Amino acid sequence: HRAGQRRYSPVPESMKSHWEHHREVRKTSFHDHGYVEGIRNWRTKNEIVSLAVVATVASGVFYPISKGMSLAALYSAANYYYIHRRAHLEPEWAVKKIPWHYDHHMNSNQDANWCVTKPWFDYILGTRVISAPALQEQNPLGIALPRVIAQGLNHLSAAYFPAKWVEKKLAVAEQLS
């Protein structure tokens, strides 16, 4: 950048809360105290407003096509917020229930494991990176399934959409092992 001028950033202002969230979570063992403060916290407020805008626009686009899809857009935004908030208020719950999101924040590669509520899209995109056996979900859908079905699904996933592994050990993963 030029001396005396602000550095140009292609990141929109609204993304500053996202990157601040990532910094906070890395420093506080996956906790995000902004969720404790609630709507008074600028990052939490920005997340809620952003989700509301996206859900409202998507719902409006889907409404003429399908009222069910319109409701699904609203539900998905609310579910995302609930899961994401709970994960960062209860890290132990997150490690057990949504380990892919824990990996997203605490893994050495934060450009992996983008999904929050379910990991299946990361498998399709090839962005699921598992950092420790304790942080591997039962199956790529991220839901509890009977063992035989989960094993079959894991076999299919490994053949067509294999997850990547990293060697970096995480403190929580070591404690869980």
Predicted regions and their residues:
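Membrane-proximal intrinsically disordered regions of secretory-pathway and membrane-system proteins
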Residues: 153-176
